[in-house]
From Swiss-Prot:
Entries under Pfam families matching the protein: RRF
Record-level Gene Ontology MF annotations: ribosomal large subunit binding
Gene name as annotated: frr
Natural source organism: Pelobacter propionicus (strain DSM 2379 / NBRC 103807 / OttBd1)
Localization terms from the record: Cytoplasm
Name used for this protein in its record: Ribosome-recycling factor
Keywords: Cytoplasm, Protein biosynthesis
SUPFAM superfamilies named among the record's database cross-references: Ribosome recycling factor, RRF (SSF55194)
GO cellular component: cytosol
Physiological role: Responsible for the release of ribosomes from messenger RNA at the termination of protein biosynthesis. May increase the efficiency of translation by recycling ribosomes from one round of translation to another.
Gene Ontology terms describing biological process: cytoplasmic translational termination
């Protein structure tokens, strides 16, 4: 039973870190990344569809993304979806493809982005601590129900704490890497 508590906790913590890393990928840095468009959905025959599923996305230059739709008639719909997504980029349409030019980030904007990243990281650290608290509560309940001894409880609590620390380190590493990427000119 305690092993189930620990494996559930690990699974939740892994998901928390994975979600943070996915959120970090969406954050605009000085370089072009197709991840910026992951949240942009467009109406494709009545269904909200990610742009990546109906067009080829490419990065021909460090600060440019090109979108080439597989169906030419979808170009205006994609363009409208990008405008409506409010991602801070203005599409330019040449009839066959859409180009998104990423303006260089100012020092002030870079600092704002880093501040937002730190808030995201802290929110995820809080989520890890909540997962840790829930796991410890479940273990204490097992001890109260006499499923495990007090010594086993202490051992499992230490394991929970060690796992929490290792996942916090992963969050810190992801934060440091993303901060370097954002601050790089």
């Amino acid at each position: 039973m305690p092993k189930t508590v620990l494996s559930d906790m690990k699974t939740h913590m892994e998901k928390t870190v994975a979600v943070l890393k996915a959120e970090f990928q969406k954050v605009r840095t000085g370089r072009a990344s197709t991840a910026i468009l992951d949240s942009v959905k467009m109406d494709y025959y009545g269904n909200p569809t990610p742009i990546s599923q109906i067009a080829t996305l490419a990065i021909p230059e460090p600060r440019m993304i090109t979108i080439t739709p597989w169906e030419a008639k979808q170009i205006s719909v994609i363009e409208k979806a990008i405008f409506n997504a409010n991602i801070g980029l203005t599409p330019s349409n040449d009839g066959k493809s859409i180009r998104l030019s990423l303006p260089p980030l100012t020092e002030e904007r870079r600092r704002e982005i880093v501040k937002d990243l730190k808030k995201m990281a802290e929110d995820n650290r809080v989520a890890l601590r909540n997962i840790r608290r829930d796991a410890i509560d479940r273990l204490k309940k097992l001890e109260k129900d006499k499923s495990i001894t007090e010594d086993e409880l202490k051992k499992y609590e230490k394991e929970v704490q060690d796992n929490t620390k290792s996942f916090e380190i992963k969050i810190d590493e992801a934060m440091t890497n993303k901060e370097k990427e954002v601050m790089e000119v």
